[in-house]
Curated annotation (Swiss-Prot):
UniProt organism field: Acanthamoeba polyphaga mimivirus
TR mART core domain boundaries: 163-390
Residue spans crossing the bilayer: none
Signal sequence, start to end: none
InterPro entries found in the cross-reference section: ADP-ribosyltransferase
Listed Pfam families: ADPrib_exo_Tox
Catalytic residues of the enzyme: 285, 309, 354
Entry GO terms, CC: extracellular region
Highest taxon of the lineage: Viruses
Protein name, entry field: Uncharacterized protein R217
Length: 732
């Protein structure tokens, strides 16, 4: 098609071009204008010629007009830059509303007039169609969409995206030595899809490791490790070198922590028996310092004294450590049992896609890069890594050992005596009686806990080791704790057989018990059954001793599947927990904590109400999830029966149906039982009613002095767990 125009400098001189790009550029620059209707007739062009030109330039997709609010200018933007301009620089598409507003400006500036001139040449409806096509294409070209499927996606885990981005394919192809080119075309990158898919960890491996963790009754241990257990375990291992006896300094006086060592041994056994990987894979780790690696030469072996948390997704860490750290790349072997454990199915941070390698693992250094060598790598992939170490897995000390042989042994160490405490005896301790309520916690910790911040109590038929630990719940850890506090103190105890936390008490004016379990699971062995009189008594006495007024006991959370379920159903059902307290009440009327001094913080009648509430008053065909279809096929007519059905058959949708309960309870959190399944134990009333005490202080006496917790926390006091990566992420 020929594009006829007249130069602005010679409006009666008709010229033409065959190139639409030249034509659009000149129109945009204001150096030419459309021919008028008389000139069209003179050239004997069709009546719709000018409109055809408008449509053609509006459908022209190589360059399109975008509006920049910062400068109030319309710019002609190349298609490859459309997505970055809109996403990163806040440029915007132009539509009829924008054009109308522009025309209606009462006192337009010269810029406004020029914008109006540019847009007068376009058919805005056609232009919008072009925008949509370009935006999608630009999105793809700018490395945000491909059709290359992740082999891990078919595990059904919700945090895994189905497709690689082009940036990921580009990075992995280069990093895995599939190409030596730093810059690849879209078609070249896509050609690496099958090769990259073969190297990545498949769904089969993730599912094997998931069911292995479940069958080992280790969900609670993995949850604990991923939250704060890894900090305490690795701090102990690195400090004492207890898994590498040959590196222990003879001059060191090591005070043993047998409780923590037991958790470490259980975790090592769990990894040692983990299924092997179907293929060789690459995992990554970012660290802040390489002091422990600097001495290595190519070919040297490094043996780690602690667990190593790695990721199969370099982009997770790459994006979050973009300010510059040290990258470690490790190649792990295929078909060797006990190499490492994929924990993402049960991790509290599944997006980390974490693979844990055990202590004593040996790594051979095969490559090292820093400074200038990394410059191209950094510029292309946006990694501001100071150094890059590449290792290959060699082995670990546990692979050929039997489980009973995995024991930590530290020669010439000190094993502190257990501090047995009968809390009931302390009720008559004059030192406690004469202390203010706010000073009791410090006195108890200083007087009755060991050097490891532990004390031991006999409750019922079991002996429990309790730990004082500290936390900061103001950042990434906020969801896992009831109290939002910089210097929080908690008391925990774990199952000696499985290593999981079976009670977690957040200390304060109220002791909050097991709030964390909504993100974990209640101890499956029922070693701790709080719904027993001996625990109600112990919690009440403990509140008295440390100066807390009440105890709030939160719901148990469990998971289940039927023996008749298929493997796929078991894999799905063992990922989702639910409130055991709600389920058992709705299922068969079971109530927890029916003690005089314990009051539920919800109304059971509100749960009964569900059995009279029609499902289709809540679940609608316009809902975006699967609930409507499943509700139709379930045959359930009321919300109570439907909730039970979802738990037993489709636990993936538990959170969805619980969100729907807002409709049932008119969006009133105060009456919605799903918002607060907990029970309030009036601890001091319990002691008063059972004649342990003869006086209950006034409420104003149950206060915590500002800074009193902080004084108890420190490296030589109650140790606070840290995770620098997650802390950094929350600060950004």
């Amino acid at each position: 098609m020929s594009y006829y125009y007249v130069p602005i400098s010679s409006p009666y001189q008709i010229e033409s071009t065959e190139y639409i790009d030249d034509f659009v550029t000149m129109l945009f620059d204001g150096s030419i204008e459309f021919i008028n209707d008389e000139q069209r007739k003179q050239l004997k062009l069709p009546e719709n010629y000018i409109q055809s030109v408008r449509e053609n330039i509006s459908l022209y997709s190589d360059r399109v007009p975008l509006y920049d609010i910062g400068s109030n200018h319309i710019f002609l933007i190349h298609r490859d830059n459309v997505y970055p301009r809109i996403y990163f620089e806040n440029y915007r598409f132009i539509d009829q509303n924008f054009y109308n507003d522009l025309k209606n400006i009462k006192k337009p500036t010269s810029i406004d007039k020029n914008n109006l001139r540019i847009l007068s040449h376009y058919d805005l409806s056609k232009l919008y169609t072009t925008y949509m096509k370009i935006f999608y294409d630009s999105f793809v070209v700018n490395s945000y969409i491909t059709h290359c499927q992740r082999p891990s996606f078919f595990s059904g885990m919700e945090h895994i995206r189905p497709y690689y981005t082009i940036n990921e394919l580009n990075y992995l192809a280069y990093d895995w030595n599939l190409t030596n080119k730093l810059s690849l075309t879209t078609s070249e990158i896509n050609s690496f899809c099958k090769k990259i898919s073969q190297y990545d960890i498949p769904a089969e491996t993730l599912l094997d490791h998931q069911m292995y963790i479940y069958d080992s009754k280790a969900i609670g241990l993995v949850k604990h490790y991923s939250l704060f257990g890894s900090y305490y375990m690795n701090y102990y291992l690195r400090k004492n070198k207890c898994c590498l006896p040959g590196e222990i300094n003879d001059d060191m006086t090591i005070v043993r922590n047998l409780y923590l060592e037991n958790q470490i041994e259980i975790m090592i056994r769990l990894i040692k028996n983990a299924p092997g990987f179907t293929k060789s894979h690459t995992v990554y780790r970012f660290v802040e310092t390489d002091d422990y690696l600097k001495h290595l030469n190519i070919g040297d072996i490094y043996q780690d004294s602690s667990f190593m948390s790695t990721t199969r997704n370099p982009f997770y860490y790459k994006e979050n450590y973009a300010f510059g750290y040290i990258l470690i790349k490790i190649t792990i072997p295929k078909k060797i049992k006990g190499t490492g454990l994929c924990i993402e199915a049960y991790s509290n941070f599944p997006n980390e896609e974490e693979i844990v390698l055990p202590p004593t693992t040996r790594y051979r250094l095969v490559n090292y890069m820093e400074n200038q060598e990394l410059e191209n790598f950094q510029n292309v992939f946006g990694i501001v890594a100071k150094k890059k170490y590449e290792f290959e897995w060699v082995g670990n000390d546990y692979i050929d050992k039997a489980d009973f042989e995995i024991k930590i042994d530290i020669p010439n160490s000190i094993i502190p005596k257990k501090n047995f405490v009968d809390l009931k005896e302390l009720i008559n301790d004059d030192n406690i009686k004469n202390l203010s309520i706010s000073d009791r916690l410090k006195y108890f910790r200083d007087t009755y806990s060991s050097v490891n911040n532990q004390f031991v109590c006999q409750i019922g038929n079991y002996e429990y080791i309790f730990n004082f630990e500290a936390y900061n719940s103001t950042s990434v850890y906020k969801p896992f704790f009831y109290y939002e506090i910089n210097d929080g103190i908690m008391v925990t105890t774990s199952n000696p057989k499985y290593g999981n936390i079976n009670i977690l008490m957040e200390l304060g004016p109220e002791i909050h018990v097991n709030y964390y379990f909504r993100y974990s699971v209640t101890d499956p062995s029922i070693v701790v059954d709080l719904n027993r009189s001996e625990w109600i008594e112990w919690l009440s006495v403990f509140s008295y001793v440390i100066g807390s007024r009440n105890v709030v006991i939160h719901s148990n959370y469990v998971l289940q599947y039927d023996k008749s379920d298929t493997i796929k159903q078991k894999q799905m059902k063992t990922r989702y927990t639910f409130s055991q307290n709600i389920y058992l009440y709705l299922k068969n009327g079971t109530k927890f904590f029916e003690f005089d001094e314990v009051v539920p913080n919800f109304d059971y009648a509100r749960l009964d109400y569900l059995f009279g509430y029609n499902v289709f008053d809540v679940i609608k065909p316009t809902d975006r999830d699967e609930l409507y279809r499943i509700t139709q096929s379930s045959g359930k007519s009321n919300m109570g029966d439907l909730y039970i059905y979802i738990i037993e058959n489709h636990p993936k949708l538990i959170r969805s149906i619980e969100d729907k309960m807002d409709i049932v309870y008119n969006y009133n959190d105060n009456i919605n039982p799903f918002k607060n399944i907990s029970y309030n134990l009036d601890a001091w009333r319990y002691l008063y009613d059972h004649y342990y005490i003869n006086h209950i202080p006034s409420e104003k006496e149950f206060t915590i002095k500002k800074g009193s917790f902080k004084k108890l926390i420190g490296s030589k006091k109650i140790v606070k767990f840290q995770n620098r990566l997650r802390t950094y992420l929350m600060s950004q």
